[in-house]
Amino acid sequence: MSFSHQEIEKKWQAFWEENKTFKTDEQAEGPHFYALDMFPYPSGAGLHVGHPEGYTATDILARMKRMQGYNVLHPMGWDAFGLPAEQYALDTGKHPATFTKQNIDTFKRQIKELGFSYDWDREISTTDPHYYKWTQWIFLKLYEKGLAYIDEVAVNWCPALGTVLANEEIVDGVSERGGHPVERRPMKQWVLRITAYAERLLEDLEELEWPESLKDMQRNWIGKSEGAEVTFKINEHSVNVFTTRPDTLFGATYMVLAPEHKLVTEITTDEQKEAVEAYQKQVALKSDIERTDLAKEKTGAFTGAYAINPVNGEKIPVWIADYVLISYGTGAVMAVPAHDERDFEFANAFGLPIKEVVAGGDVSKAAYTGDGEHVNSDFLNGLNKQEAVEKMIVWLEENGAGQRKVTYRLRDWLFSRQRYWGEPIPIIHWEDGSMSALDESELPLVLPDLEEIKPSGTGESPLANAKDWLEVVDPKTGMRGRRETNTMPQWAGSCWYYLRYIDPTNDEALADPEKLKNWLPVDTYIGGAEHAVLHLLYARFWHKFLYDIGVVPTKEPFQKVFNQGMILGENNEKMSKSKGNVVNPDEIIASHGADTLRLYEMFMGPLDASVAWSTNGLDGSRRFLERVWRLIVNEETGKLNSNVKDVEGNEAFVRTYHQTVKKVTEDFAELRFNTGISQLMVFVNEGNKQEVLPKALIEGFVKLLSPVAPHIAEELWEKLGHTDTITYEAWPTYDESLLVENEVEVVVQMNGKVKTKLVINKGASKEEMEAAALADEKVQAAIGEKTIRKVIAVPGKLVNIVVG
């Protein structure tokens, strides 16, 4: 071993901690740069090698920006509420707070051992009452503005977990955690009106430097559709249907309601009641994903009722079917089987009529979904789709049968969880049926310490068991009330944590407005693609709301977002405990060192690619650092090599250095770390060929290496004679004029055969090339007594002398 990574890494980590090297100086001059990591959920398993990939990327940026004169904010914290900690507590009998603290301590130790340049004075945890005071404050503001409300919602109820799950917590009809069955059940829930921001969330994506694929995921989730809302009468009732194809209204031959639609019980005839109720029970056991699976067999039940098609007065049967969701649109669809695939399959399954209204296909065999001339459509006949859509909307509006409408796939955000380990919702329900919000002065509403945190199983959270905390009396009126027993979802704390880092100890406000102005928006935010939709969408929604009420100065929270790829096991499979292919960073730090792990994870491929872990690759990264060490340090004495001197160096090596500064600077700024590191390797290879190493160039190289491998860089910096940390040294700059070669090697031929090679000025003219070739001793000897017939010079390449 050429250097002891254990000694060097411990030494410099202790130095950084004692000196608070990475503390952000609010008073510092210069531009600001905010480098943010998606903060981790501190699980019991500790850090795995996937975590440091994103953290190393932001750390390289933060370290480089400090050296470029930026005032850098680079914080870390913990997303510590949520289901897994509570589930663990239920399984083991330990309190989630105890378990969470242990996990945070482990994560923090592991992160510090990797040498990340975080300002630990800004550390936050979503479970800290000083933090969640402001999460609750944001909720109160949303409630004040009518954006937080209670609604009866068909929710995913998991009896085994005793809680409601969001759609994204369900995989293939069972809970993601534990694989328990999930059923649909109506419940009173807190909901946030994110739909009020749908258009802005969509439009403002254009201003962001995000990967296009990520923007598309958000666009699809928001799911804007333009069309018309059409009113159908069913007896004395009416039902609104949204359609993007109002032009096909003449082809509507039946209607389908979601089985949960409130009209179903009112319109179902006595003859159909039994079949309808049986079908409703069957559907309650299915998830939305199962219900909308295109490949599955169509099922449904006839209600016995008929709706009137407003455009032609025809009676059409009303069915219920699971492929229509109450949570999407109005929970009712007009079925046009000739021109919609699902409607076509349903019509065939139940023998319902199929009426062609757009020519161009054979609707006896399949639905025709393309454009074409309208037929069997009265005043729309002969028109194409766009003209017919417009004309039908005008007709609907003139006849009071409908209107132009824009809808979004985005649903309001189900915000309550029947769990203990989350932020309490600061609301009181009074015995007279009213409810009121806590006053801001009463925040934080602290989570009570419970012995027993088993779900109540009634739909209420374990907080229903905390009698002293739960029951309140209004001191003015004597009226009794109960606190809200639901808690907030894990998303709540992670929606705004990047704001609290800016001013983490402020008791008077969420953060100081001046500080927010200095640091927002976040310059670069790096994290896993699994948060591409929900976390980023929820955070953008809260940020826009806070902008509207004057708390934050920007419309968007994150200017640039980058999703790192996944680190797979050596067999190209996802790392998991069950497969036994998880790599623990503690072991790598012990065997190879933190610098090696950092270097390897940045060198293994493009940052956004998923790449398999390779022990050989890890060994290669260690060998490179050993080569760096040997280039600069004498292994026997441990001092600087004697060939590192205050000299200028030869032109070729100076050129390699300037090329290295340029490439590393540009590649690191664009997160192309693997190609930047390749160039560092080129420099070391060239350095090993030099008899003398110019000290200034070696110092510049060590600075370039320092963001990737900070411990070894600090040690080398010290050996180069410096007494202070490398952290705030000036980042190297390059000279454009020294990037290119000024001289070029040209071949001299005689009658097409190579006689010699000459090094001449790159810009030499043909005449100068000829003169240099003819003056060369070897050439003169070869010409001898022969006559020169012709000299051909190709600038920068060759001189051919024709003799006879």
Curated annotation (Swiss-Prot):
GO CC terms in record: cytosol
GO molecular function, one term: aminoacyl-tRNA deacylase activity
Cross-referenced Gene3D superfamilies: 3.10.20.590, HUPs (3.40.50.620), Isoleucyl-tRNA Synthetase, Domain 1 (1.10.730.10), Valyl/Leucyl/Isoleucyl-tRNA synthetase, editing domain (3.90.740.10)
Subcellular location: Cytoplasm
InterPro entries for this protein: aa-tRNA-synth_I_CS, aa-tRNA-synth_Ia, Leu-tRNA-ligase, Leu_tRNA-synth_edit, M/V/L/I-tRNA-synth_anticd-bd, Methionyl/Leucyl_tRNA_Synth, Rossmann-like_a/b/a_fold, tRNAsynth_Ia_anticodon-bd
Position of sequence motif 'KMSKS' region: 574-578
Motif ('HIGH' region): 40-51
Gene transcribed to yield this protein: leuS
Annotated Pfam families: Anticodon_1, tRNA-synt_1, tRNA-synt_1_2, tRNA-synt_1g
Keywords linked to the UniProt accession: Aminoacyl-tRNA synthetase, ATP-binding, Cytoplasm, Ligase, Nucleotide-binding, Protein biosynthesis
Family statement: Belongs to the class-I aminoacyl-tRNA synthetase family.
Catalytic activity: tRNA(Leu) + L-leucine + ATP = L-leucyl-tRNA(Leu) + AMP + diphosphate
Annotated residues for binding of ATP: K577
NCBIfam families reported for this sequence: leuS_bact (TIGR00396)
Enzyme Commission designation: 6.1.1.4
GO BP, one annotated term: leucyl-tRNA aminoacylation
Protein name: Leucine--tRNA ligase
